[in-house]
Amino acid sequence: MSKQPSISYKDAGVDIDAGEALVERIKGVAKRTARPEVMGGLGGFGALCEIPAGYKQPVLVSGTDGVGTKLRLALNLNKHDSIGQDLVAMCVNDLVVCGAEPLFFLDYYATGKLNVDVAATVVTGIGAGCELAGCSLVGGETAEMPGMYEGEDYDLAGFCVGVVEKSEIIDGSKVATGDALIALPSSGPHSNGYSLIRKIIEVSGADIEQVQLDGKALADLLMAPTRIYVKPLLKLIKDTGAVKAMAHITGGGLLDNIPRVLPQGAQAVIDVASWNRPAVFDWLQEKGNVDEHEMHRVLNCGVGMVICVAQDQVEAALASLRASGESPWVIGQIAEAAEGAAQVQLNNLKTH
């Protein structure tokens, strides 16, 4: 008989009991997000979901995303309550731009050592995001992987599926010269540009928990959860039928995201003076001495979503969005692009 001690999975760094405790903690979160189309609860091998009634030619739309290095900031600040909403927002906002209603969401949480309290806090945030988006949290994967991540550090990924009527897909093909561009405000940098943001914090030596901007701690401004635009945009589509294109302003800012929904030969002319840039972006620009063009190439600079409608639909669109509690404004219009011109023209750029 070998005298070698018996080695358990726990000895190897994986605590099955902790994983099971987490599942129990988050069952209520998932239940709060349930849609009638979802069949069964958490814990099965696969999640089942019917297509909602009323669709004639339903088209499924899928997306996956993470929250980038905003997660590193969350870990450094030990602030985990809103990063889950960020994760949902990054996925569902990408779906709604083609007119899709998000149906269900799954998450992947990987860590070196599972901290049940932290993981439950993150998943509670995911559930809150799903409620804001009107989709069901139907499952996920929690992977405890010692040796792959340092201590209780974790990484997140989200996966979402939505549905849209085939004849009502919004793809930008109807965008025409003279159309108006309407913007919706962001809550801050959302979930993009955080490698630049963290570098600026490092170089400036700023204590972001002590720095105050507009009466708020810089840390809170940087960790403000990504806004979820799903319900106001679905209402806008239903109210007006006027939406020709939408762009979720993520990594790449206005310069890289608007062209993704423009047809050949169209140019978006944006008036940067049409909104007051939130103080957090001015602080980042000043402390990092960031070029103005680079600001708009990396960060959203206060714009979370851009919507294209015909000029004669502007007032109806603004009214619908305001009725949903949004603060929209006209940010620019569509022009015919000169040969070789960029698809986005930024006018009235700041000089500093």
Curated annotation (Swiss-Prot):
Domain of life assignment: Bacteria
Entry-linked CDD domains: PurM
Keywords for the protein's UniProt record, in alphabetical order: ATP-binding, Cytoplasm, Ligase, Nucleotide-binding, Purine biosynthesis
Metabolic or biological pathway: Purine metabolism; IMP biosynthesis via de novo pathway; 5-amino-1-(5-phospho-D-ribosyl)imidazole from N(2)-formyl-N(1)-(5-phospho-D-ribosyl)glycinamide: step 2/2
EC class (word): ligase
Reaction(s) this enzyme catalyzes, per UniProt: 2-formamido-N(1)-(5-O-phospho-beta-D-ribosyl)acetamidine + ATP = 5-amino-1-(5-phospho-beta-D-ribosyl)imidazole + ADP + phosphate + H(+)
InterPro entries: PurM-like_C_dom, PurM-like_C_sf, PurM-like_N, PurM-like_N_sf, PurM_cligase
Molecular function in Gene Ontology: ATP binding; phosphoribosylamine-glycine ligase activity; phosphoribosylformylglycinamidine cyclo-ligase activity
GO cellular component: cytosol
Subcellular location: Cytoplasm
BP term (GO), one: 'de novo' IMP biosynthetic process
Keyword Chloroplast among record annotations: no
Family named by the database record: Belongs to the AIR synthase family.
UniProt-recorded name of the protein: Phosphoribosylformylglycinamidine cyclo-ligase
Species annotation: Ectopseudomonas mendocina (strain ymp)
Lineage: Bacteria, Pseudomonadati, Pseudomonadota, Gammaproteobacteria, Pseudomonadales
